[in-house]
Amino acid sequence: MVINSVLIIIRSKLNTLQGCPDPSQCQLLNVNRDTLFSFHEVSEKFLQQMVALYVASHYKNSPDDLQLMSDAPAHQLFVLVPPIAEDSKHLPEPLCVIQVALEGRISRESVKNSLSRGKRAAGDLIPWIVSQQFQDEEFAGLSGARVVRIATNPDYIQMGYGSKALELLVDFYEGKFANLSEDVNGFAEETITRVTDAELANASLLDDDIKVRDIRKMPPLFSKLSERRPDNLDYVGVSYGLTQPLHRFWKRASFAPVYLRQTSNELTGEHTCVMIRPLGSSEDIAW
């Protein structure tokens, strides 16, 4: 039971809203991972709700997913929440969770070396797939965001929350929430506390001091999209096991297929499909 609690393996019970808010009234918030994994009671409760959505909406989950969520350097977390009253003192219920991995900006030399050897480095899934399949040395130099997971509360499936969360995510990366009158120093930046190699070499589980961090010294758990500076991206993409409902979902969000694996996955029997959506206007897209 202790291991289950630490790794949040046991599925938490999902809350049920009193009524269903209109998707147009919901907002997408950025989640600060440093605060989310601070061991504070409030943050821990929300983390359990997020993991519960993951477990309820996907056939395969493991502690590795939790590790990626916590400290993968290029990952970002977003949650779609119902309207929040200004005087509310309660955590909002997550209707949908989106986990994103930033990819790309691979040097042309690295692409050439990998293509010549028929191998690719770990990570940067979509850039490497497109580069290998199309023998394209330019695409990997672009910057993109890959949707790793998008999980909606199973009680609210087919109600438009996933589509709304994805729409707001694309709007964020296109800079539609940016306030041009704001000073750049006013943006909230996520900082993940990391240890050095020297600290790891001298560390020991016997003398580790694991404790709840002072919540007063932590950044807010949530940030509005208008408070975050979006990364300068060229596209948003996704890689998933092809099914008719999933293809319909991504196509409706204006994603276009660029790759379909010829052989099926041994575990699921599905064929991997990669779809992307360019960001910005068509006049700005040179590729």
Task: Say what each PLM segment does.
Residues 1-61, 68-75, 79, 85-94, ...:
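Terminal substrate-recognition subdomain of acyl/acetyltransferases
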Residues 156, 160-165:
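Conserved acetyl-CoA pyrophosphate-binding loop and the N-cap/start of the following alpha-helix
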